[in-house]
Amino acid sequence: MKDKFSQQAATYAQFRPDYPSELYDFILQNTDNQGVAWDCATGNGQAAKVLARHFEKVYATDISQKQIDNAVQVDNICYSVQSAEQTNFEHNTFDLITVAQAIHWFEWDKFYAEVQRVAKPNATLAVWGYSMPQVQDDKINQELQDFYKNETGPYWDFERRHIDAHYATIPFPFEEIKTPQYQIKVEWDLAMLEGYLNSWSATQNFIKMNGYNPVDGFIVKMKTLWKEKEIKTTIFPVFLKLSKFLKIN
């Protein structure tokens, strides 16, 4: 499992969008018991804080201490620094295991073996992510896609391709439940977009190699198209893989 977000942990916590309530509703409808959940690669606890409203106990793990330090604190969430592939949890512990926007960084065979070990019989595994945002303005969206594909494109890690493929390229050796299509819809000003772009691992890779931030020049260009404090509807496509019985095919 790779740690790609320690350096920008505070930015990640502030500017990453929340997942839609309908996604959680569907996951809960397909979970037999709401006792104990594991949110793996929790980041800043975005998913864990929602699960905590429904489960007696949520264990939230991440490989990054800085991410854990920036995580939201809730009484029934227990945070710890652990990898996805090897944990200290007991066998048959969890009713639900979730991974949000992170499984593309995992060693899949080892993670799935760990899932098999720590999941209760008939537990649910839910894995989801979101891809590039679409700003509801054709000119701005064209510039944003160009920034993603061309300016920062060479600086994305190889694993990013799994996001672009909506996880179709990631093995999922369990019986899948057909899932609806979801989206994250936000109303953003330009400052929010700037913060989100600065949370990208590709942005940090670019800075390390070139000594300057590519987002700065992009935002200067955007200011000719996007007025200060002007609100734009922005949509992130969300994709979900879900299994209820965790039987290896």
Task: Give names to the regions the model predicted.
Residues E85-L96:
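A short acidic, Gly/Pro-enriched loop at the edge of an enzyme's catalytic core
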Residues K4-P17:
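Class I SAM-dependent methyltransferase Rossmann-like catalytic core
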Residues A165-N249:
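Conserved Class I S-adenosyl-L-methionine
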Residues P17-G35:
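Conserved alpha-helix/loop element of class I SAM-dependent methyltransferases that forms part
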Residues K110-N122:
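A short glycine-rich, Lys/Arg-flanked "PGG" loop and its adjoining helix->strand segment in the class I
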Residues P121-V186:
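Conserved catalytic/acceptor-binding region of the Class I
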Residues W38, N44-Q86:
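Class I SAM-dependent methyltransferase SAM/SAH-binding core
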Residues D95-D109:
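A short SAM/SAH-binding and catalytic strip from SAM-dependent methyltransferases
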